[in-house]
Amino acid sequence: MKVCKKKLFSILFIFFSINVFAKSSDLQIHYINVGQGGSTLIIGPNGTKILYDFGRVSGRKYIVPYLKERLKLQPEKGIDYAILSHADKDHYMGYRDIVSQEFGGFNILKANYEPGTSKQSKTLKKYLFDPAKDENIKAGAFRPIPLGLLIDLGNGAKAIVVAANGNVLGDDPFEKNNRSINENDRSISLFIKYDKFQYILDGDLGAGREKCSNHQTSQRDIQTKVAQSLLDFGLIDKDNGVDILHIAHHGSESSTSWSYYQLVKPEVGIISVGPDQGNFLHPRVDVVENVLTCKTTDGKFHKDACSKERGGDTRATCYSVGERAPPLKALYQTDYGSPGESSTGRTSFQGFVGGDIIISTDGNTNYSIEWTGNTIHSPKTVHYESIPSGKTNFKFDETR
């Protein structure tokens, strides 16, 4: 652990020395609405592009148009890194359309990364591994991402790989190719920092069972180890936590436990979710109302939902009110979940549905969250009124 810390601090020292005089610009994080699944584009101040996950068979329908038409990206200039969080269909099947000359034509320039999955299937080969081997793809075949990898995003901004394939930076490793690891728990966890701004993106990573928040799951608790690693390395502050948290696994009860939330203390949460999800009931009330915020009489998110005027803080009653991390200031989701209820929970509709969600920050004064209102219509879900595009600004508050 001590050796690992020294190595990381040496890397960070060199990194800051090199980039201290870089030109200032915004960091952007785009949650592309692919429905039930995930695809997130990170654009650094220096223009470095990381595409994290590629959605289902939606590359040509959702991702490619977003990249070309909304962002005006030129395929021949490419995307620097393609990172697959884990090998589930709703995270990888769009890759083929993104890189194929027929649809996207985007070149991957520096690396195609995956967590080190042991999963093998014809579908995985067809939609991910084989397309990456095309002679037009400069980065070449997918390969396991190195734990602790640091990607320079420019002007002091960086992305660090804190977890991959069930292993966490600074923690004892799992056995290589351990097939007992749930594929979700192989998810790559990226920590992104730009001056005052901090953000965690971690696919479908699990937080394990927890009585306090009524989480029932077969997934392991990897998220709490990630949070502890960030604290141990001094990458986040124990009192202030992170600004924005990716609510992993589409808001499933497998992830985002109270123990994890208590350590990362986010201000804003974002859920990538959508219709046509079967009986998963994402996002779940036991995550939204037991961890992120409190239950409300109208079923909608209210910033003061946990105030005394609204009935007090009803989350995680195994902790005293004074010990609990503050509830979220805002909760966004890319689309509506499918309504339903089972013996283990039901769907939450508290999150503000925004379609594509764009985070922008200069790293110093504030960060903003913008939404397009672009939702996906399906007969299998509930749709409310049309959503206009909009934007909200958040000031950095290191004493919250």
Q: What positions do the PLM features span?
A:
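Bacterial N-terminal signal peptides that target proteins for export
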Residues: 1-9
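Cleavable N-terminal signal peptides
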Residues: 10, 20-21
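Flexible, acidic/histidine-containing loops and adjacent segments that form or flank the divalent-metal
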Residues: 23-28, 34, 74-76, 81, ...
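Active-site metal-binding loops of divalent metal-dependent hydrolases
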Residues: 34, 53-57, 87, 164-166, ...
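Active-site metal-binding motif and surrounding structural segment of the metallo-beta-lactamase
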Residues: 45-50, 57-110, 231-252, 265-270
